[in-house]
Amino acid sequence: VFALQETKLQAGQATLDLPQYLEFWSYAERKGYSGTAVFTKRAPLQVLHGLGSEYLDTEGRIVALEFPEFWFVDVYTPNAQNELARIGHRMEWDDAFRDFCKGLEEGVLPGDVPVERADADGLVVLAPEAPKDTPRHPLGAGHMPKEVLPCTEAGETSSPKPVVMCGDFNVAHNEIDLKNPGPNRGNAGFSDEERGKFSTLLAAGFTDTFRALHP
């Protein structure tokens, strides 16, 4: 499994010759912006495209794949921007992302999230309102825009299981994570607010595996 962030593509804009991999993309509504993708040799049970927030799910920042043993979450966290112009949005995102991951860990799916699931023939299930001429693809074989996918319903559950998250978190948690922490203190990615939210994520029971292996 490998994950990409900031793909900046829309559905159908790229054709990759990776026959051994299934591919799952999340797209931003704004063209040429943001986006995430996951490529896997193992077929997932289902794939979520978003956190379950109409406000936060317009930029294609989440692809979450459920496997029998764990959830794999690819994330591209919003940048707080110069002078922390987007810090409020960032704080909302960090809280929603933490709740999303804890929910998956506990077996609770967010509602109203576009989801890829295969039917008995292995083809992606389409939303009832999807256009009649929408092409059907095997799971992971096509670029499925979220507009043609069904959405999860509030209260849906899955099996509780570990969550593995990776991607661009847009934060340097501690001074050891930056070459020159002093001049960057308070800047986007190294503000007290963002560092604090990452601490809260770890306090919720998750582990920074890179730092655990390289203290």
Positions of predicted regions on the chain:
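Proline-aspartate-enriched helix->loop->beta-strand connector
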Residues: 1-7
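A residue-level signal for conserved active-site and pocket-lining positions in enzyme catalytic cores
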Residues: 2, 39, 72, 168, ...
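Conserved residues at the C-terminal ends of beta-strands
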Residues: 5, 26, 212
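A cross-family glycoside hydrolase active-site/sugar-binding cleft signature
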Residues: 5, 76, 166
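Structured beta-strand-rich core segments of catalytic domains in phosphoester-bond hydrolases
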Residues: 8, 13-89
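Metal-dependent phosphoesterases centered on the DNase I-like endonuclease/exonuclease/phosphatase
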Residues: 22, 96, 101-131, 135-139, ...
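Charged helix-capping and loop-helix junction motifs
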Residues: 87-97
